[in-house]
Each structure stands twice: as structure tokens, then as C-alpha cells.
Amino acid sequence: MYDILPPELWIKIVDYSGEINLLLTSINFFELFNLVDVKVNVIEYIIENELIDVLKHIVVLKNLKHPIMGKNIISIESLNKCLLDSCNKGQLKIVQHLINIGANIESNNNYAVLLASGGGHLEVVKYLVSQGANIKSKNNRVVGWASQHGRLEVVKYLVSLGADIRSNDDYAVRWASEHGHLEVAKYLVSLGADIRSKYYYILCGASQNGYLEIIKYIVSLGADIRAYNNCAVKWASQCGHIDIVKYLASQGADIRNDNDYCVGLASKNGHIEVVKYLVSQGADIKTYNDHAVKVASKK
């Protein structure tokens, strides 16, 4: 097809249409990138359309130090952006080719390995590590991110490389618990993670988000359910998690703490079943000058 018309005409056709599809159909057409005036981001277009063979060809050209690679048709900014997107999606082959072309795995504080870890893409994580990615950057944020997203196998791998699960005030177990990832939380605790970190924020976060099994597990370890001024039952009441409110109350949480603040929060947010339960347990809806009644009447 390339030989049907002289290169000059192909260049005019591409410049007029603004489309680069044609240039990606053969080696001869690809050479015309030196001569055309297109506004399309080449590497992003290639990645979005998963044109693996084109990526392979670019790797070959780079290794050969072909003149076309010096024409800025592919910027380092585009490479790095596409690398992050591919790591997030777990596209190992694309990640490998992008790095071979020149994408920087350490850009944005090793954000590539963080995204791959959060996405649970273990093979991508392993490859990035083999290429020098730093799993301990930003105070071991990578293992915390994997924990937050419930990626147990990734967490185990990172730990095997020396990731510090206790950094950042036990960030890993706090976020695993707050997001309901029980198996990750158990694993981290087995390695020494402290459930009491940050005034039992684990318990409060799990209560706020409605993760009863996490709460039961933490309580089984001896957590103080009244910690941080009974924040757990307050947040559960505020968010309408009736089963958690009942469980915490059964374990000794003070539902009347702060002048019946729980019933006020439940009323404010329209959680009638929680309000009924709290009242049945002795909560006074008239506390704070009928605050609960006034707030509920405004909804």
C-alpha cells in the first residue's frame, strides 16, 4: 500500500486528516513520523489501542538509536503517564515495553509500584521491583496502599522484601481494617501490627464504615471499645449501622456518652432504627435542649 503513492502525498494526507492510524500500519509508514505535522499524542494513542506490535517496533528503533527516536514524537511525560495507567490496569507486557523505551519507574515517588500494588497486580509489582522500584518510598506507603485495597498476596510479597508494616502509625492495619479487609488485618496483626495505634482509630474507622466482623476481631484482641471518648459507637450511630451499635452496646460501649450524643447523631442523619434502639436502651432524646428532636424535625 505504501508504494501506491509517493511519500509526499501520504504526508499531505496525514497532515490534512490529523489521523495517525495510517502511520502505525507498517514500518515504512511509521518512518513518516519524521515528516508529518500531527498533534496526536503518539504513545498515548498506541497504549489506548493496545498496539503491542507497534510498541515492540519502537523498542527496536530505540535500541538501534534510529533518528526518528530523536524527533520528540514520544515525550518522557507521555511515557510516564502511560506507565502509571498500565500499572494501575495490570498490563504487564505494556509496562515492560514502556520501561524499555524509557519510562521512569521512579517518577512521582515510585507511584507506579504503588498503583500496581493497590490494584493487586503481583506480577507487575515483581517486575517493577526487578527494575529498581523502591517499595519503601514515602514511608512505606506501598504496603499501606496494598493493605487498604485488600491485596493480601501483594502485602505478603512486600513484607518478604522488608516493607515496614508498622510505619506511619500502623497505617497498613488501620486502613485494611477501615476498608473491611479482615484477612489482611489478621495477617498484619500476626506480624506485630498494633491495633491500638492512633487511639484505636481502627475500631472507629471500622465502625464508621460498617465492618462488623473487623470490629469483632479487634474486640477479641482486647480493644477498648470506649477508647477515644466512645468514638466507635458514635460513628456507628452517625452512619446508621444498627448491628454495630447493638454489638458495641452489648460489649459495654457507653451509648449515653457526651449527653446522649449518639442519639443526636443518629437523629441528625435520619437513622430512625438506631434512634429507636438507643431510646430503648435509655437514651434521652431531649438532651441538649431537645437537640435530637429539633434536628430530626428539620430533615
From Swiss-Prot:
Q: Know the name of this protein?
A: Putative ankyrin repeat protein R864
Swiss-Prot/TrEMBL keywords = ANK repeat, Repeat
Lineage at the top is: Viruses, Varidnaviria, Bamfordvirae, Nucleocytoviricota, Megaviricetes
Q: Please list the residue ranges covered by the ANK repeats.
A: 78-107, 108-137, 139-167, 168-197, 199-227, 228-257, 258-287
Q: Which domain of life is it from?
A: Viruses
InterPro entries according to UniProt = Ankyrin_rpt, Ankyrin_rpt-contain_sf
Q: Which PANTHER family match?
A: ANKYRIN REPEAT PROTEIN, GH09064P
